[in-house]
Design a protein with these regions (language model features):
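Internal, conserved structured core segments that host functional sites
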Residues: 114-147
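Active-site environment of divalent metal-dependent phosphoester hydrolases
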Residues: 13-18, 43-46, 69-73, 141, ...
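Conserved beta-sheet core of the metallophosphoesterase superfamily
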Residues: 149-203
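Active-site neighborhood of phospho(di)ester-bond hydrolases with catalytic His/Asp-centered motifs
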Residues: 9-10, 35-40, 62-67, 135, ...
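N-terminal active-site segment of His-dependent metallophosphoesterases
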Residues: 1-60
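Active-site neighborhood of divalent metal-dependent phosphoester bond hydrolases
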Residues: 58-123, 151-160, 165-166
Length: 203
């Protein structure tokens, strides 16, 4: 049996207490093969500094960049009329988010920039005849996951180079709500602020 167990953390948004709890769950498990963080680590939360410190303690964790991590790198707040995720620049909610992005960046300083700069856009593993793809929302855009039609088109493209693959699993964060969609040999399953482990096997 080919198998691998993943612990997945995503969309922490500086909720350091939830992150501590997630790490405690991981530490209680003896069979975790890989920890993956799906991004949006710092903005929109109260404690980016201690969040960064905790994330740095995760052994061999793969960090994937979320849209809010990208905003930090792009210095979204320096744009003349910054907007995000389809919001109007005049929307008070958009303005509040942009202000929080700036505050978060100031709290983290260069250490936060370096950390986010080292993040990946996506990560892929092949376990037996199963391909598992991890990303924040999608490799083509980090602020909206793919529709099922888009995901199947991606699967068909990948299948050309990997004819041996029998099952595709696409794991993303960003949405903060459950999504478990299956079609043919494709499964889309997001996660949110908590942590869970996944096991994929071929007998």
């Amino acid at each position: 049996m080919d198998s691998k167990t993943f612990a997945i953390i995503t969309d922490v948004h500086s909720n350091v207490e939830s992150l501590k709890h997630s790490i405690s769950i991981i530490n209680e498990r003896e069979n975790i093969d890989q920890i993956i963080c799906l991004g949006d680590c710092f903005a929109l939360g109260p404690d980016p500094i201690n969040t960064l410190k905790l994330l740095k303690t995760l052994p061999n964790c793969i960090f994937i960049r979320g849209n809010h991590d990208r905003y930090l790198l792009e210095k979204l707040w320096t744009q003349e009329r910054p907007n995000l995720e389809g919001m109007s620049p005049d929307d008070p909610l958009c303005q509040a988010i942009v202000a929080n992005e700036e505050w978060t960046a100031n709290e983290l300083g260069d250490a936060g920039v370096d950390f986010c700069s080292a993040m990946r856009i996506a990560y892929r593993e092949i376990i037996g005849n199963t391909l598992v793809e991890f990303t924040h929302a999608w490799y083509q855009r980090d602020d909206q996951p793919p529709s099922m039609d888009e995901a199947l088109a991606w699967r068909n493209h990948v299948a050309v180079a990997h004819p041996e693959i029998e099952q595709y699993i696409f794991i993303h964060g960003h949405v903060h709500i459950p999504r478990n969609e299956t079609k043919e040999n494709f499964i889309a399953c997001p996660s949110h602020i908590s942590v869970f482990s996944c096991r994929y096997s071929r007998r």
